[in-house]
Amino acid sequence: MASANQAAKAEAKKVIEKVAKEVIKETKNSAQRNQGPGKRWNSKKGRHMPKNNNNKGMKRTVDNEVKQKLKKEGLEGPRSRFSVRVSATIGKIGPNKEQGPELQIATFLHPSLMKEPNDGTNFGPLQAAAAQWGLWRLSSLEVKCTPLVGSSAVTGSIYRMSLNLTQSPGNASWGGLGARKHKDIPAGKSVSWKLQRGDLAGPRQTWWMTDTNEEGGQSCGPMLEIHGLGKTSSTYQSQDWTGDLFIVEVLGRWEFTNYNAKPALGTLDRKSEDYASDATGPGIMVGDDGVMKMTLPTASSLARFMSDASERSPVNEGSVGETIWHIVDEGAGLASSVAPTPFSWLIKGAWWFVKKLAGRSGANADEQYVVYASLADAQNNKPVMANRFDHTKKATTLTVTQVNSPNTGPGVTQAAYHTENPFPLVPATQPPPPRSIVVVNATARPFGYVKYNTGDSNVKSHGKFDGTQYHFTLKRGSTVSYASAAYILTDVSMLTYEGNRVTGCYDPGWMEPTGITVHYRNESSAFGRVLAYEIDQWGSTSDNHFTIGVWLVQTIKDLPAHDTTVWPYIPLPYVSAGNCTAPPVQVALDKACVPYLTKVGVTSHQQCTVRQPQVRSGTFMLVYSIGTNTPATTAGFTTGQPLGEATNASALPEGKISTSGFWERALSAVAPYQDFISVKFTLPQGPHADPRVDALLDLIQQRFNLKPVDASESEDEDEDSPSGSEEEPCGEEPTPPQPTPRLKLAKEMMYEALRDSDWTHVDAEALLAAISSKN
């Protein structure tokens, strides 16, 4: 970029000199011709003679001729079609905390980025013009530094404004800053610095491109930097000065040409945040991969500002976003103490570029951002490679500017600018981004109630059948979990949150499946698909823990209403002795349990009847389990059976912090017929295979008799009939069936079936491979 700009200037200079010589020569010859021989005595002017204005006229003529020649040669590019004169505040200059040069302000002069930090996406006249025109340039610029404190109140510091034309940081020594075009600012004095078009000219015949997604050297424009030298002290007190010293404003005339509307360029934002302590501050790290990364606390406002919401599409785990962020370490916290070699100069320069790295190790982990040394490197995905450096956090002040917008067109689901109430929220017809925090709100009613007779019941069913049969089985591959209860949801809505901000409204029907299927009891065909899950453990010791698993499910087939017989359980605090007619009821204050439930007058575990309602395909459900099992290593699953003992009791520690909002409902035995419910989920890192494919394969297998029928399934209907038996549940798992000759010949039968069905558009080999893997 620099070489092209210099070449253009050199060519323009040659043309100007050539034109000037020709014009001067022609003007002199014309003057000599007009001067007659009889007037030569008047060549020496006395004091009484009027001054000759030929020099002024010659200068005016030269200027006009040069301008015409430059326009004819096309060295100034297209003419300006629109201009706007704007005064903008770009920030404040604070005190220097150390002796060395410290960066106070670094901002591009691009019209979309000329705004005060934390000004939001305010749509001023300059931003409106940037959103409509394809080329811009500055015809003039004046930088004003207005003091906020008198010169007698502070001492020890001087500041320097300089112009950086390279769009990349460097080793900022005080002498190096003086080698640029610059202006010094004494403390307490008002300073004005005027720059002309030649100082700010762009590489395209003095023009810059407006779209910041283009090459950085062609678009973002010059950068104004302000550094301070010397530690700032108070002259009235023997201590450091802590207040601001100057407010910085720019007054410039921006010119535009080549109409090319890109609305998103007018909404680029800029935010600043103070970090008071090292523990909660930003950090720098270099892992084993050698890539330098910046970290921010997840709960910080800058982390929410730089979230996945700024990306064009959801970012997959481990990938890097498209949005480029300009980071300025105004507090000099990182610049003064963090120095990963060999790029220590970059951090000490106090500004760099980052892109968001998707995925994190846990809900409380820091957000990570890949560091780039220049805007061109960020656009070309060339991160900073440095020696391994342990994660180091420091208290500082960061200012973050959104440099580009991957989608420069008008917003589809979220208005960039509006003046009316945004409600009612309209659900987006797309899934929320991975790792989003979503809250599902719905009207809910229990899946069933426990009944020992025809009387009324308000006790929810936590049902278990013989062996490992529960109301629901969750599967993905060979991993299995069990759920004993559920809620049926209606009027379902879903909101995404970042901190205390609502960031989106979504229809759960658009959610990506997690790859986990839900099976009614132990049926082979899937009853539903899991859209989100939350597994939470209370207690951490090997023998004292409770776990709940909550799965948001969308059914994919109908379940008719019917009565079934189960072994009931009931979640409670641990009851030691006593009853409601002979108080007090004695409970263990630190224990919870899910013991057997039985009717009055019976001491052994007795089966009961549960009337299950009809469930239509497409219904949303909350399937859940509670018991003494633990979270599995596979995300979205629990280990073992939740109800495997007589009492399923566990002592629980105090101070449990839960985020799902479901513990109280899971521990409650009594529930109304209908109630409002809210449950919080953290979405997984990425979508999985659609379980409807598995359901289709199951139907194909059943249609062509390619899958043997489990003998235990034919006995389910007999087990569902209430018998009033008081037998103890069988703890042994049924023996799986042995492969039959029919199963072994599945491949040959599938070939014949596909041939007879004329499914010419189906990849038979792929379908057979999938069916063979399922068996």
Swiss-Prot record:
Which keywords has UniProt assigned to this entry?
A: Capsid protein, Clathrin-mediated endocytosis of virus by host, T=3 icosahedral capsid protein, Viral penetration into host cytoplasm, Virion, Virus endocytosis by host, Virus entry into host cell
Site residues by UniProt (Cleavage): P314, V315, N364, A365
Compositionally biased residues, Basic residues: 41-50
What is the superkingdom listed in this entry's lineage? Answer: Viruses
Per the record, what is one GO cellular component?
T=3 icosahedral viral capsid
Query: What are the disulfide bonds?
Result: none
Region entry Basic, spans: 2-71
Q: Name one Pfam family in it.
A: SP2_M
Q: Where is this region: Inner core?
A: 72-264
Query: Which GO BP terms sit in this record?
Result: clathrin-dependent endocytosis of virus by host cell
Q: Which residue windows does the record flag with biased composition (Acidic residues)?
A: 712-731
Region annotation (Disordered) maps to 25-61, 707-743
Q: Which family does it belong to?
A: Belongs to the astroviridae capsid polyprotein family.
This one is known as Capsid polyprotein VP86
The species this protein belongs to is Mink astrovirus 1 (MAstV-1)
